[in-house]
């Protein structure tokens, strides 16, 4: 899939901008909105660890701040290809359970998941009705 290649490439570039002086765990993300626009993010750590933010949430918040609300896919690149944390999965779920999650490592291996496979019982806006 051409979009997957582009998303993984952009996520890898975003990873280079990560600020991870404490964990040394750099993460990059690229989020494809249904509008066709792509938003990138990197993790930003803070000496007060709880104030750090993940790459996936940076990408989502950038997109939302530009008016996006519907997303198709997100690519996440780490050294060893780990999936997004629970908080990031929940933030993505806020905007739809049909988002494809692509994880890749720095060697080029990748896996793709449906968001609902990663967060099968996510809390959604419908739970508030």
PLM regions: where:
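Short, surface-exposed loop/turn motifs that are enriched in glycine and acidic residues
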Residues: 1, 20, 48-49
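Short, basic/aromatic recognition patches
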Residues: 5-20
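Residue-level detector of intrinsically disordered, flexible termini
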Residues: 10-13, 29, 72, 86
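Short solvent-exposed loop/turn micro-motifs enriched in small/polar/acidic residues
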Residues: 22-24, 85
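Short beta-strand scaffold segments in enzyme catalytic cores
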Residues: 26-33
